[in-house]
Amino acid sequence: MRIDLRKNAENDIRQLRATNIPAAAAVMVALEQIEADPKAIDKLTTHGDDPEVGKADPVRLGIKRWETAKRHGAPLWRFRIFDTPATVYRVVYGYHWQTKQICILAVVHKEEFDYDNLDSEIAKRILDDWRAI
């Protein structure tokens, strides 16, 4: 399965790398494992903790739907990566069913992102990026 890492998400990872190299590395490893997992789409669109992605050295994820965005017409999700320096970060994404891709829209610190506030700068950016796909 191909992952579409959007430009703003790339910038988020670049900024994370500048401040927390181990967390950025954990995010990149998780994305690589997701891309290599043939069941990733099912796992990433099912709410729950502990799905493992990848084969050789699987990573454990916590998957949740972004409910506020969904109620406003954006079927977006987020995952966190357990047992890594990136556990305090959330990867926000959507599944683009026409292209069968996971589109990574943002990597955010959990304390800096309020999922209920769609008027925040980061929420607007994520929603704009999703609608532009």
Indicate residue ranges for each PLM-predicted region.
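Basic, Lys/Arg-enriched alpha-helical interface segments
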Residues: M1-V88, H96-C103, V107-I133
